[in-house]
Amino acid sequence: NLYQFKNMIQCTTKRSVLEFMEYGCYC
């Protein structure tokens, strides 16, 4: 799903990569 993918990219720029890998993206 393209929207989810774009949202994921926006999240990873705001959050640390390690945090993203552990918890996933909840925006």
Swiss-Prot record:
Binds 1 Ca(2+) ion. GO terms for molecular function: calcium ion binding; phospholipase A2 activity; toxin activity. Snake venom phospholipase A2 (PLA2) that inhibits neuromuscular transmission by blocking acetylcholine release from the nerve termini. PLA2 catalyzes the calcium-dependent hydrolysis of the 2-acyl groups in 3-sn-phosphoglycerides. Expressed by the venom gland. This is Phospholipase A2 1. Its cofactor is Ca(2+). It is an enzyme of class 3 (hydrolase). Belongs to the phospholipase A2 family. Group I subfamily. GO terms for cellular component: extracellular region. Keywords: Calcium, Hydrolase, Lipid degradation, Lipid metabolism, Neurotoxin, Presynaptic neurotoxin, Secreted, Toxin. One of its GO terms (biological process) is lipid catabolic process. It catalyses: a 1,2-diacyl-sn-glycero-3-phosphocholine + H2O = a 1-acyl-sn-glycero-3-phosphocholine + a fatty acid + H(+). Its main location: secreted. Its EC number is 3.1.1.4. It is found in: Secreted. It comes from Micrurus nigrocinctus. It comes from the Eukaryota. Signal peptide: none annotated.
